[in-house]
Amino acid sequence: MESILSCPIVSVNARVWRFWSFVLKHDAMRYISIIPVTVMTFFMFLDLGHSWGDFQDVIIKGYFAVLYFNAVLRTLILVKDRKLYENFMEGISKFYFEISRIDDHQIQSLLRSYTTRARMLSISNLALGAIISTCFTVYPMFTGVRGLPYGMFIPGVDGYQSPQYEIIYLVQVVLTFPGCCMYIPFTSFFVSTTLFGLVQIKTLQRQLQTFKDGIGSHENKNADLQVIKLIQDHKRIIAYVSELNSLVTYICFVEFLSFGLMLCALLFLLNVIENHAQIVIVAAYIFMIISQIFAFYWHANEVREESMNIAVAAYSGPWVELDDSIKKKLLLIILRAQQPLEITVGNVYPMTLEMFQSLLNASYSYFTLLRRVYN
């Protein structure tokens, strides 16, 4: 556990999860967050049924209901598979410190750069989430009417009469923070782990280009051992991406379906509302959805593209003067690198920028259809 918390590329998200006892420990904090947020999400979906007819209200409430549903789903999967996540992060810690001991200035510079990037993204995501969540909770105070941050229908309770209104409002404000911690760290975890995948891939590329440095032209045995080590590193990277995919693929599938639909609905809502404050709010919701999806697809696409560049690195290495047996080993690396390492949506479609563009195109197509029907 200490090795995970001391590994800088994943420690930010690991510490948040550990605080809420989702991983690395098991105490009451887990239930203090999961159970109330799950109950609140259930009442949010009940409220959707009672708001049917007012499409503007339904879309806004649907956005928050889907957002909290995804937060609960992410957390339940994380808790259910916590041993898999802990073992995965333990492996990251081991490989991270192994790479940090490589005596190569370019590799160390690469490791520092990607570590800083991962930590900055994790911290900024949490800070941005806290700011936006605060805006969600205080916005109803400035509307001039009694409203809640998130629509809720509790059978037998009038949520807009005192003192029920004040109690429900306070509960929603309190639960917003754990809800934020249930949702955002998973996105940051995905980004951090894909960035570490890129570190491993680029390290392998560098070593393929320089593995013969310091080895004499007649020391083929040492060169052969180096190439065998590089093949093992390549296999380790393949296993790493496969394990990462198994942890996130179905969550990515739910995100693909839910946020694709919500993006379409919010674009439609943006087209029909006239209140300037609501336009700003809806535009912020759209930005959050697009940035969330883009973070997934951009980094997954980078892993895919760089994994294929391993073949280029192997071919551009010092292979000309090597024995045929070593050349054949390098050829195996080149052949395997032709098959890209992919993170997929539900083990069906690879997460690429082309797929991201297709999702945006589909959402916009449904939006134009809705607009024509509405007009």
UniProtKB/Swiss-Prot annotation:
Keyword terms: Cell membrane, Membrane, Olfaction, Receptor, Sensory transduction, Transducer, Transmembrane, Transmembrane helix
Location in the cell: Cell membrane
Keyword Transmembrane: yes
Membrane topology: Multi-pass membrane protein
Any one GO BP annotation for this protein: signal transduction
Any GO CC annotation of this UniProt entry: plasma membrane
Keyword Membrane: yes
Expression by tissue: Expressed in female antenna, maxillary palp and proboscis. Expressed in female body. Expressed in male tissues.
Deletion phenotype: RNAi-mediated knockdown does not affect mosquito blood feeding rate.
Single GO MF annotation: olfactory receptor activity
InterPro entries: 7tm6_olfct_rcpt
Pfam families, per database record: 7tm_6 (PF02949)
Principal place of residence: membrane
Bilayer-spanning residue ranges: 32-52, 58-78, 125-145, 167-187, 250-270, 279-299
Highest taxon in the source lineage: Eukaryota
Family named by the database record: Belongs to the insect chemoreceptor superfamily. Heteromeric odorant receptor channel (TC 1.A.69) family.
Function: Odorant receptor which complexes with Orco, a coreceptor, to form odorant-sensing units, providing sensitive and prolonged odorant signaling and calcium permeability. Can sense indole, 1-octen-3-ol, 3-methyindole and an insect repellent DEET.
Protein name per its UniProtKB record: Odorant receptor 10
Species whose genome carries this gene: Aedes albopictus (Asian tiger mosquito)
